[in-house]
Amino acid sequence: ILEPFNHNRKIIGFDTWEGFPGTSSQDPTNIKARDYGATKDYEKYLEELLQYHETESPISHIKKYQLIKGDISNTLQQYLEENPETIISFAYFDLDLYKPTKDCLRLIKGHLAKGSVLGFDQLNDGNFPGETIALKEVFGLDKFEIQRSPISPLQSYIIIK
């Protein structure tokens, strides 16, 4: 978005569009599979929105985004296997749950560079402890300063050093 001429910088979005594929013992007991699904036709709407944005950008003939449907624990692994050149500059986790967050953190670890940013929607959130547990297990909490916005207490990020 901030580098409209950099055709190597892409936005890759992963979603089931159908809600959580499942939960684990590290997740709250009040959530279940299929919770938090997207509204009808949201996938199509988002695709149209991204395509419109693309047409308004320089070098609009080169597609710089991709939406991938499915359980990210599987689809991210497949994406990285098919695109081994991937260097991740920014990854945002709004997965809410332990297993997919941990799976993804493990998968992207070798694709991060100094300065890469990992953003989280539910870090240190007692309602969804899975993101915090996964980050703690994969990266540890003593290696990074957790940054937060002063106007939004939920979202946070770390910078790989």
Where are the regions a protein language model picked out?
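S-adenosylmethionine/decaboxylated-SAM
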Residues: 1-161
